[in-house]
Every structure is written in structure tokens, then in C-alpha cells.
A protein has these predicted regions:
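Pyridoxal 5′-phosphate
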Residues: 1-361
Length: 361
């Protein structure tokens, strides 16, 4: 990335982008390989929310149409559903979770009908280690003939993703989380057979071509969802991050992160004054916990001073889950493949000290 920035400074942005075209093409190809699709099915964005919006706002919806979604849907997605429902008269139906805390497949099957135009699901929520049964939802969507939009922001780079196994029509992701890429990067994958059912909500010189008069033609494939101006240095960095993940192997990454996550979750759960709050029959490396006598922000700051980087859950990021469980905010741990067992042990010891100190007069 620094090499490209220097090249832009030396010869100019247009010229540097032209020289970097091969690297840019590699990014599309790497992302396609990452999710099991084709390069022409990939569109690039500056974040995953813009990628998700480009997909969602391209779905024609009208009065009486139904959007089915889960209780763990990301907050920005929920806001978009609400806005479009107000504009179009479409109906939002929130599918309940089952006893394990994941989307209830039986309830989803019963709620799907001929009015269902979209099933939108967040695969891994920002609020915990739950891994929703995305492939099972895909089978239900396919049988119903509904479009299936999968938010894989917390999934890509953490474990294997295959759009054909999952059965989604649209999938969105980011570069900055488990892919370990630069901030300001996101992508959309669109199944080619879904294109005819979508109407991109922005037409501009990257996404369409003027035919003369009053006509225009959409660009081929997923490029019709892109905009002309891009940060090519970020695109190059994203490609490098994806290539590294592919070289390491997503199966190996998934096994490693899951093992570390389960170890951390189990060890934290044994500590007096600490409760973990991750749901689902399948869980990933995201671990959430509450420390008695400590606010999440205070605990995160204290751990940060010990060079243990964590974050906190924010109610607005998962409003339906917050409403359901009423336990936010929580401390969120996200171990990755490069972390060691010794670092897990040090983290548990630091949390134990925080919990113990909170209980002392």
C-alpha cells in the first residue's frame, strides 16, 4: 500500500491506477475465490454497510411485500428496513430465535409465503459468538423463491464461506475485521441469476453506459453496483489481505479461531463474577462477557492499559437483540489465529483480577 501511495505522489493518481490494474484485478479474483464465486459477481465498496445498502436498496419492494429478518440483524440493516417499509408499504417480519438463541428455522418456514420478497440475515452478529444456520436459511429461501441477502461482515476471514453451500443471492463483507485488511474496504457478491430481479439504486458512469437520447445500459455483472471513484490503495491492500487468508487456508483459520474462542469462553465462564453471553449451537471466536461491578467501557479501558485489546457491544448496533435480552453493553473479545494460548491465559488472568478488584471494598 505504501508503494502505491508513493507512486501516486510521484506520477499521479490516474497513472498509478493504470499501472496497478493487475493488482486490482487480483483483488476481484481473490474475493471471488474467498466466497466461492466468480470475479464478475464481485463489486467493491468503501465499507460493508455501503455494500449492503447497494444490494438492499436495489430490491424492488411495494405495498404488502414482506421482508423477513432475524433478531440478530445489524442495526444499520434494521434502519434500512424501516426506511424502505415507510417508503414502500412493505412489511417487516422479525423471525424469533429458537431455544438455542439462533434464528428459528421452523418459525421461518411457517412465516414464509408468496408475499415474502426478501430474507435478510446477519450470519454472525456483532453482539456475540452466535453463528446463525445460514445454509438452512438458504434452503428455505430457495424453496420460497425469495431473495436471500446475507450479511457476512463478521464471518469472512474467520471461517470458510461458500456462497453455493449457503445458497444466498447476495452477500456482503468487510476487509477490516477478520480479513485483517485496511479500513475503508467492503465488497458485495451478487449471484448472476439474481441480477434480473434487482434494480441498482444509483446509475453513474461506472455502473452504466448512456445509449444516447434517454436510454442507458447497466454494466455487466456486479460492476453495475459500483461507483467510479475508488481508493485504489485500499483495494490493493484488501487484495493482499484476502490472498494471505487464502494462503493460510480458511479451514485452518476457522479451526484455530474456534479453538481459541471456545477456550477463552470456557475459562472466562469459570471465573467468579464473570458471565459469558454467547448463544447458538455453533459459536465462533467472538466472545462476550459481563464482569460484575464493572461497566463494559471501564473493563475495556483497564484491559487496554494491560495491552489487551478488546471492544464493547453497543446496543444500537444490535437493537433487536438488545431489546430481547437486555444485557448490553458487554466486553467483546475477538481472538484470531495469530493469538497464542499464553495470550488467552493472560487475558483470563487480567479479567479475573478486574472481577476480584470490583468485589473488594
Amino acid at each position: 500500500m505504501t508503494t502505491h501511495l508513493q507512486l501516486e505522489a510521484e506520477i499521479g493518481g490516474y497513472e498509478a491506477a493504470t499501472r496497478a490494474q493487475e493488482q486490482i484485478d487480483v483483488t476481484y479474483a481473490a474475493l471471488a475465490q474467498l466466497v466461492g464465486g466468480r470475479s464478475d459477481e464481485v463489486a467493491l465498496f468503501d465499507n460493508s454497510t455501503h455494500a449492503w445498502n447497494a444490494a438492499f436498496y436495489s430490491i424492488p419492494l411495494g405495498p404488502g411485500d414482506r421482508i423477513l429478518t432475524g433478531r440478530d440483524e445489524y442495526g444499520s440493516n434494521v434502519l434500512a428496513y424501516l426506511q424502505v417499509a415507510q417508503r414502500s408499504g412493505a412489511e417487516i417480519v422479525v423471525v424469533p430465535n429458537d431455544g438455542d438463541g439462533q434464528i428459528d428455522l421452523s418459525a421461518l418456514t411457517k412465516l414464509v409465503d408468496e408475499r415474502t420478497k426478501l430474507i435478510g440475515l446477519t450470519w454472525v452478529p456483532t453482539s456475540g459468538g452466535l453463528v446463525n444456520p445460514a445454509a438452512a436459511v438458504g434452503r428455505i429461501a430457495r424453496d420460497a423463491g425469495a431473495l436471500y441477502l446475507l450479511d457476512a461482515t463478521q464471518a469472512v476471514g474467520q471461517f470458510p464461506v461458500d456462497v453455493n453451500d449457503v445458497g444466498c443471492d447476495l452477500l456482503t463483507g468487510t476487509g477490516r475485521k477478520f480479513l485483517r485488511g485496511p479500513r475503508g474496504t467492503g465488497f458485495l457478491w451478487v449471484r448472476d441469476t439474481a441480477l434480473e430481479r434487482l434494480d441498482p439504486f444509483v446509475a453513474e458512469i461506472r455502473s452504466a453506459t448512456w445509449d444516447g437520447g434517454r436510454g442507458f445500459t447497466w454494466a455487466d455483472g456486479a460492476r453495475r453496483f459500483e461507483t467510479w471513484e475508488n481508493s485504489y490503495v485500499n483495494i490493493i491492500g484488501l487484495g493482499a489481505a484476502v490472498q494471505q487468508a487464502l494462503e493460510l487456508g480458511l479451514d485452518a483459520i476457522g479451526d484455530r479461531t474456534r479453538t481459541l474462542g471456545e477456550r477463552l469462553r470456557e475459562d472466562l465462564g469459570r471465573l467468579p463474577g464473570v458471565t459469558t453471553h454467547d448463544l447458538g449451537t455453533h459459536r465462533c471466536a467472538i466472545v462476550t462477557a459481563k464482569i460484575a461491578g464493572r461497566s463494559a467501557d471501564d473493563a475495556a479501558a483497564a484491559l487496554g492499559r494491560a495491552s489487551i485489546n478488546v471492544s464493547t457491544t453497543v446496543a444500537e448496533h444490535n437493537p433487536l437483540d438488545t431489546e430481547e435480552r437486555g444485557i448490553h453493553p458487554l466486553v467483546r473479545f475477538s481472538p484470531h489465529y495469530y493469538n497464542t494460548e499464553a495470550e488467552i491465559d493472560r487475558t483470563v488472568a487480567a479479567v479475573a483480577e478486574l472481577a476480584s478488584a470490583a468485589g473488594r471494598p
